[in-house]
C-alpha cells in the first residue's frame, strides 16, 4: 500500500493551464507535488486536479459532512463551498460549528460561510434567528470564509438596513459576499453588484449573466439535480473564459 505522503502516479496528465494532455509521472513527497516528469508510461488513466463544487448545501444530501466527503471524493470532488443555512435555521451557530468540526474529521476541504438568511424569510418559524452579534461572531471565525448567499435580493437592491449591515460586517472582516439573485438584470443587477456582491449561481438567461458580469460579478453556471442552466449559459465560456 502506498504511503499517503510519499508516492508517484503515472498516466495521462491533464494540464489545465496549457490546455494539453501528456504522458508522464507525478511525484508526491510529504504530501506535496514535488515534480512532474514527461515520459512514456504504460498506465493509460488520466490525472488531473480535484474538482471544487462552488455551491452546495451539504445538508440537502441528508448526510453529515464527513460521510458526504466519502461519497463525493470517489467522483473527483475534493472540496466544496458550502452555505450551512439549513442547519443554521434549526440549530443556529451551534449547527454551523458542528458542520465545521465534523468536516475536520476527513481529509476533504469544506469552505463554510456565514449564513445570511436565518430565518430564510420573515414569514416562517425557524429554530433560530441571527442578529448582529451572531453575524459578528461567525464572520470573525477563521473557519468561516465568506458571507453566504444574499438571498433577500430585493432587500439588497432597496438598501434594507439589516441586509446592508450584514454586508458591512463581512467587509469589516475582509470576507467576500456570495450572491443569490435570480432573474435580475439592468439597473437592479447594477444595484445588487454595487452593494458588494461578488458572485451569483442563480442565472437563467444570457442577458442576466452578461449584465451581472458587466457590473463585476462572477457567474457560476449551475447544472444541478434540480435547476439546470448549462445549456442556456455555456456560450459564456467563449468570451469569458475566466
Cite the ranges covered by each PLM segment.
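Acidic-and-aromatic substrate-binding clefts and catalytic sites of carbohydrate-active enzymes
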Residues: 61-63, 88-90, 226-227
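Active-site neighborhood of phospho(di)ester-bond hydrolases with catalytic His/Asp-centered motifs
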Residues: 48-55, 82-85, 113, 148-150, ...
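N-terminal metal-binding scaffold of metallo-dependent hydrolase/deaminase domains
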Residues: 1-40
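Divalent-metal coordination cores built from histidine and acidic residues
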Residues: 69-174
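Di-metal (Zn2+ and/or Mg2+/Mn2+) metal-binding site signature of metallo-dependent hydrolases
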Residues: 45-69
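Divalent metal-coordination and catalytic microenvironments
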Residues: 31, 44, 55, 76, ...
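Active-site regions of enzymes building and remodeling cell-envelope glycoconjugates
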Residues: 39-45, 196
Amino acid at each position: 500500500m502506498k504511503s499517503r505522503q510519499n508516492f508517484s502516479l503515472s498516466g495521462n496528465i491533464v494540464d489545465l493551464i496549457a490546455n494539453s494532455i501528456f504522458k508522464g509521472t507525478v511525484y508526491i513527497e510529504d504530501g506535496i507535488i514535488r515534480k512532474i516528469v514527461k515520459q512514456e508510461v504504460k498506465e493509460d488513466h488520466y490525472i488531473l486536479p480535484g474538482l471544487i463544487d462552488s455551491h452546495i448545501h451539504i445538508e440537502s444530501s441528508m448526510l453529515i459532512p464527513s460521510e458526504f466527503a466519502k461519497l463525493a471524493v470517489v467522483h473527483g470532488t475534493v472540496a466544496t463551498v458550502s452555505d450551512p443555512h439549513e442547519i443554521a435555521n434549526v440549530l443556529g451557530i451551534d449547527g454551523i460549528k458542528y458542520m465545521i468540526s465534523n468536516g475536520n474529521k476527513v481529509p476533504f476541504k469544506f469552505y463554510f460561510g456565514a449564513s445570511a438568511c436565518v430565518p430564510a424569510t420573515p414569514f416562517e418559524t425557524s429554530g433560530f434567528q441571527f442578529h448582529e452579534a451572531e453575524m459578528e461572531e461567525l464572520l470573525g471565525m477563521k473557519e468561516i470564509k465568506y458571507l453566504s448567499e444574499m438571498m433577500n435580493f430585493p432587500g439588497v437592491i432597496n438598501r434594507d438596513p439589516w441586509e446592508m449591515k450584514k454586508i458591512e460586517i463581512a467587509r469589516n472582516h475582509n470576507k467576500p459576499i456570495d450572491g443569490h439573485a435570480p432573474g435580475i438584470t439592468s439597473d437592479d443587477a447594477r444595484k445588487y453588484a454595487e452593494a458588494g456582491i461578488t458572485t451569483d449561481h442563480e442565472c437563467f438567461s444570457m442577458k442576466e449573466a452578461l449584465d451581472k458580469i458587466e457590473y463585476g460579478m462572477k457567474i457560476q453556471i449551475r447544472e444541478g439535480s434540480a435547476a439546470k442552466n448549462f445549456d442556456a449559459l455555456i456560450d459564456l465560456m467563449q468570451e469569458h473564459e475566466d
